[in-house]
Regions:
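Active-site histidine-anchored catalytic micro-motif
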Residues: 1-137
Length: 137
């Protein structure tokens, strides 16, 4: 059986945000006993990631690392009409990725003890983000 749902995440400021609870709240219940969850964000200036869910410093450090790797206001950027944060946001989105696949075991997401699902927002004002969740089971 395959199920699919689309939902909107609340707008977030720039940075890495733990969204595991928001994802779980929007998934159809019950989840299959065994399967896969694919999450896809329908935008080009944010990303999805799995990372540590306990220490908030990880979230701020990830933002700092991405800003170090992909800097704003580089003179070689051609795509600049939408603001200094736009082209770097597209590059960061490509580096991180816009989809995740998570195993489902015993009707629950089979994440590690310290793993959480992140929305990485790379725009200063990215707005609400749309997620497509496809459940295979």
């Amino acid at each position: 059986m395959i199920q699919q749902t689309e939902f909107r995440l609340s707008a977030k400021r720039r940075g890495c945000h733990l969204i595991t609870r928001e994802i779980l709240d929007n998934l159809p219940k019950p989840l299959p006993k065994v399967g896969l969850l694919n999450l896809f964000v329908k935008h080009t200036s944010c990303a999805l990631s799995i990372n540590e869910n306990a220490d908030p410093d990880v979230r701020s450090d990830m933002e700092k690392i991405m800003n170090h790797i992909v800097r704003e206001n580089e003179p070689y950027y051609d795509h600049v009409l939408d603001g200094a944060d736009d082209m770097p946001a597209h590059a960061k989105s490509s580096l991180f990725g816009v989809s995740l696949t998570i195993p489902i075991t015993d009707g629950r997401l089979n994440l590690g003890t310290w793993q959480g699902i992140y929305l990485c927002e790379f725009r200063d004002y990215g707005g609400a983000r749309r997620i497509v969740a496809t459940i295979y089971g």
